[in-house]
Swiss-Prot record:
The keyword Iron-sulfur does not apply. The keyword Transmembrane does not apply. Belongs to the MIF family. It comes from Xenopus tropicalis. This is Macrophage migration inhibitory factor. It is found in: Secreted; Cytoplasm. Keywords: Cytokine, Cytoplasm, Immunity, Inflammatory response, Innate immunity, Isomerase, Secreted. Homotrimer. Substrate binds at K33, I65, N98.
Amino acid sequence: MPTFTVCTNVCRDSMPDTLLSDLTKLLAKATGKPAEYIAIHIMPDQMMSFGDSTDPCAVCSLSSIGKIGGPQNKSYSKLLCDYLTKQMNIPANRVYINFHDLNPANVGWNGSTFA
């Protein structure tokens, strides 16, 4: 159930129409989790600054039950920053990604939890 959230000051109109689908496929492959469980939440047009500049930037989070940790996070960071740079023109040095390894008992879905 990986969830990837992106808050950005980039306007919606400049984002590719395939953004959600692309990120879903990218994360399904990277995490080894089924695409059916991947959730993507993009919040464009945010009032944001990074380093006292309002140039394009993003603050993101990737949450998952498992598949989060040291070497994996470095790999995800590279993959996601590369995508955001290529598709949204956000330089990698203007992106923060917070990683969260979730306890299955604390994640609800379909009227129950993953525990």
